[in-house]
């Protein structure tokens, strides 16, 4: 089945281009941003605006509550269903997002890994709370150095999952190597936005300031009230810093600076991930929706 993928780093303009392509190709947009699946976290995840949603139908937004799990396998299954529905109605599926795990799972399938073990997860999370996240990361490094090199010490969710997988008898790296992601599940036109680094950083910095001015603090306040002040570990970038500012632990400028840095680092990881994907066409700005639509139609 054919589809269009609009990928690229955060703040590069994916949503605007996806909407423009949808209008020209008769398409509908399937979200592939892991942060936009959470209900109620709109400003801090830069979800499509009401105007953008009115301009083109969107799928796979607002799927789960904050703190709930959403992994690549579940995303791929939901995306498969949405894509099939769109195509069955004679429309063009346009996948938009920069979450590498989600994109890879959709295009090439998922690794068959052991299921979740709630008891082990609780024990590992308690260990991290007692000894610190770097200590748990060091434990992963002893078991699977390659996985530890890919995962940041503070990314508790991924460190715990990697150790959970390793407890099943094979390390994450062994499973990934065996899978190799060779299968192409879709005939996809892969477009990746590639703005110059200075331009991208300026866009990120401006977006983060707009988030703080436009409702991120209010969303963080509502989360803190809902969870009794202790925010869930699995939250998009920016909410922990916004909550820290509300508690008086960070002044506003420092909170903004930290979120800007975190988004820049995330953008870098997104680009590195996409560089590994085969068949990607990198698009430099200014983006020309008309020319790109013609390019897609000629495939």
UniProtKB/Swiss-Prot annotation:
Q: Where is this site: Interaction with substrate tRNA?
A: 99, 121
Q: Which residues form the signal peptide?
A: none
**Which key words are in the record?**
ATP-binding, Magnesium, Nucleotide-binding, Transferase, tRNA processing
Query: Mind telling me which InterPro entries this protein's record contains?
Result: Dimethylallyltransferase (IPR039657), IPT (IPR018022), P-loop_NTPase (IPR027417)
Asked whether the keyword Nucleotide-binding is assigned, the reply is yes
Q: Name one GO biological process term.
A: tRNA modification
MF annotations from Gene Ontology: ATP binding; tRNA dimethylallyltransferase activity
Q: What are the boundaries of the region Interaction with substrate tRNA?
A: 33-36
Q: State its cofactor.
A: Mg(2+)
Q: Which family does it belong to?
A: Belongs to the IPP transferase family.
Quote the function comment for this protein.
Catalyzes the transfer of a dimethylallyl group onto the adenine at position 37 in tRNAs that read codons beginning with uridine, leading to the formation of N6-(dimethylallyl)adenosine (i(6)A).
- Protein name, entry field: tRNA dimethylallyltransferase
* Organism in which the protein naturally occurs: Anaeromyxobacter dehalogenans (strain 2CP-C)
């Amino acid at each position: 089945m054919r589809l269009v993928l609009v990928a690229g780093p955060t703040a590069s303009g994916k949503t605007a281009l996806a909407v423009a392509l949808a209008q020209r190709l008769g398409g509908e947009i399937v979200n592939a941003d892991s942060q936009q699946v959470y209900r109620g976290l709109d400003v801090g995840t830069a979800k499509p605006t009401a105007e953008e949603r009115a301009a083109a139908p969107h799928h796979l937004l607002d799927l789960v509550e904050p703190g709930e799990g959403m992994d690549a396998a579940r995303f791929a299954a939901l995306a498969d269903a949405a894509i099939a529905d769109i195509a069955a109605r004679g429309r063009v599926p346009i996948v938009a997002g920069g979450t590498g795990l989600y994109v890879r799972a959709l295009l090439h399938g998922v690794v068959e890994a052991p299921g979740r073990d709630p008891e082990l997860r609780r024990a590992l999370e308690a260990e991290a709370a007692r000894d610190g996240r770097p200590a748990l990361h060091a434990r992963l490094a002893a078991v699977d150095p390659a996985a530890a090199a890919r995962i940041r010490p503070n990314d508790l969710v991924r460190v715990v999952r990697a150790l959970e997988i390793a407890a099943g008898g094979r390390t994450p790296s062994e499973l990934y190597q065996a899978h190799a992601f060779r299968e192409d599940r879709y005939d996809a036109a892969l477009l990746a936005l590639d703005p110059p680094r200075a331009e991208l950083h300026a866009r990120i910095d401006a977006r983060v300031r707009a988030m703080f001015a436009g409702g991120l603090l209010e969303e963080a306040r509502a989360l803190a009230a809902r969870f009794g002040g202790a925010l869930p570990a699995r939250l998009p970038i920016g909410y922990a810093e916004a909550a820290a500012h509300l508690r008086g632990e960070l002044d506003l400028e420092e909170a903004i600076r930290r979120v800007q840095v975190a988004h820049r680092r995330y953008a870098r990881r997104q680009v590195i991930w996409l560089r590994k994907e085969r068949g990607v066409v990198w698009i430099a700005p200014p983006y020309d929706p008309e020319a790109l639509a013609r390019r897609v139609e000629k495939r």
